[in-house]
């Protein structure tokens, strides 16, 4: 996130169009792509600091959200990864889960690697981790049909 005063300074001093700032910030501004799955795939084959930063920032934001939820519900038994990034990137899952090792959350690295639906945590992990593939568009369609 940005300090709100930065936007005013950029506009007044640098004449930066704020709509362009929003359009070209985030993953796109860091890496030239807004597709995190493509960024993670490209980062496997090369060492690009901006790609690494984008991945780390994404994982940090997810870790903050999950950590906050865990503290509010006073514990966790299961973390489920779904959606494009959740099911498509073993690297993202590994990085996110690493932050929660203090909860005795341990991934089974072989299961995590193959992106198969089911439990991907180590059998001795206190907190289980699951991978669930869904057709997001089909799920959205089901919800929308309830309103028609």
Pin down the residues of each PLM region.
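Generic structural signal for well-ordered, non-membrane alpha-helical segments
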Residues: 3-4, 14, 51, 55-59, ...
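A conserved active-site cap/scaffold subdomain adjacent to cofactor or substrate pockets
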Residues: 1-23
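Glycine-rich phosphate-binding/hydrolytic loop that grips phosphoryl groups
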Residues: 111-148
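Adenine-nucleotide phosphate-binding core of ATP-dependent small-molecule kinases
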Residues: 19, 23-73
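Gly/Ser/Thr-rich active-site loops/lids in small-molecule metabolic enzymes
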Residues: 1-8, 95-107
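Glycine-rich phosphate-binding loops at beta-strand->alpha-helix junctions
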Residues: 77-100
């Amino acid at each position: 996130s940005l300090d709100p005063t930065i936007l005013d300074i950029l506009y007044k001093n640098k004449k930066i169009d704020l709509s362009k700032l929003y359009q070209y910030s985030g993953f796109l501004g860091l890496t030239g792509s807004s597709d995190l799955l493509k960024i993670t795939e490209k980062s496997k084959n090369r060492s690009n600091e901006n790609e690494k930063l984008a991945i780390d920032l994404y994982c940090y934001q997810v870790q903050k959200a999950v950590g906050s939820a865990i503290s509010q519900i006073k514990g966790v038994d299961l973390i489920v990864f779904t959606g494009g990034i959740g099911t498509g990137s073993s690297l993202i899952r590994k990085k996110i889960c690493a932050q929660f090792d203090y909860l005795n959350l341990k991934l089974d690295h072989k299961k995590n690697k193959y992106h198969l639906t089911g439990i991907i945590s180590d059998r001795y992990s206190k907190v289980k981790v699951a991978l669930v593939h869904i057709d997001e568009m089909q799920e959205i369609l089901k919800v929308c049909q309830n309103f028609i």
